[in-house]
């Protein structure tokens, strides 16, 4: 009876006894709008195992890596569009970043919280970087996939000066 939610269109194959339901994302119209702002589609798919040994194979829409996180009553923030699938018990909400809008970087995050399995995907390879308390690390906003809620982040231009900002992106 295990249930997994996935982005619509992510299913590659599944056991014939897996039950599939289409669901709208979010709670109500504002929840659906918030989910869409956070990078989720308007609909998701819910897969429920009805027999022992049921399986499902999922893949993102583009090439790249998939990685698994086991959440245990904690919260992560994921880049818009990184969510592939997760346990039904996880709560997912969209969250725009005022920091990103002011800086022009356009970072929208998905807040994923609770306990359960979570699969995220990325265009390209995934590198996991564990930070020590107080350690700083610079990541381009277009390449950041996810981070724990305990991480404090700021959005800055990597290059100094107007010409350097245009030339470096």
Model-derived features: positions:
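Phosphate/adenylate-binding glycine loop and adjacent helical scaffold
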Residues: 1-169
């Amino acid at each position: 009876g295990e249930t997994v939610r996935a982005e619509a269109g992510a299913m590659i194959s599944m056991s014939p006894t897996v039950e599939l339901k289409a669901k709208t994302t979010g709670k109500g119209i504002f929840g659906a709008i918030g989910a869409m702002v956070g990078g989720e589609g308007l609909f998701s798919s819910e897969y429920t195992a009805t027999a022992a040994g049921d399986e499902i194979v999922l893949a993102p829409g583009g090439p790249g890596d998939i990685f698994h996180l086991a959440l245990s009553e904690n919260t992560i923030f994921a880049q818009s569009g990184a969510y592939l699938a997760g346990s039904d018990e996880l709560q997912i909400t969209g969250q725009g970043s005022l920091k990103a809008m002011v800086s022009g970087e356009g970072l929208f995050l998905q807040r994923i919280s609770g306990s359960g399995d979570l699969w995220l995907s990325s265009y390209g390879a995934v590198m996991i970087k564990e930070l020590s308390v107080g350690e700083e690390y610079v990541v381009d906003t277009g390449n950041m996939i996810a981070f724990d809620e305990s991480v404090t982040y700021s959005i800055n231009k990597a290059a100094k000066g107007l010409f350097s900002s245009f030339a470096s992106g």
